[in-house]
Swiss-Prot record:
Belongs to the hssA/B family. InterPro entries: HssA/B-like_chaperone, HssA/B-related. It comes from the Eukaryota. The gene is hssl48. This is HssA/B-like protein 48. GO terms for biological process: sorocarp development. It holds the Pfam family Coiled. Residues 1-20, 78-97 are annotated as: Disordered.
Length: 97
């Protein structure tokens, strides 16, 4: 299992402020998923940046668990928060890869 960090600076139009989100996660290469999909995923416990739909955080595929597409999918993720293009509970692929 490989650890990685994703850093994103997001501007919130409603407050005109920037928030820096740092998320540490672990990606796996189980099944058809690659480690890169972990960084793109925003599944269970993922972070939805200021409600703007940026999916950062965990993209796990452990024992058929949570699999997500992160910012590429706009439905509800494993964590139950609205996706809006951020969190997604997809087929395990990352950004169409």
């Amino acid at each position: 299992m490989t650890l990685f960090a994703s850093i994103s600076s997001i501007s919130n139009p409603s407050t005109s402020s920037k928030s820096s989100i740092v998320s540490f996660g672990s990606g796996t290469s189980m099944g058809s998923n690659s480690i890169a999909c972990g960084g793109c995923g925003g599944g269970s416990g993922g972070i939805l940046g200021s409600g703007l739909g940026f999916g950062l955080g965990l993209g796990l595929n452990l024992s058929g668990g949570f699999r997500s597409r992160g910012a590429c999918r706009g439905n509800n993720g494993g964590s139950g928060y609205p996706g809006n293009g951020g969190m997604g509970g997809g087929n395990g692929s990352c950004c169409g890869i």
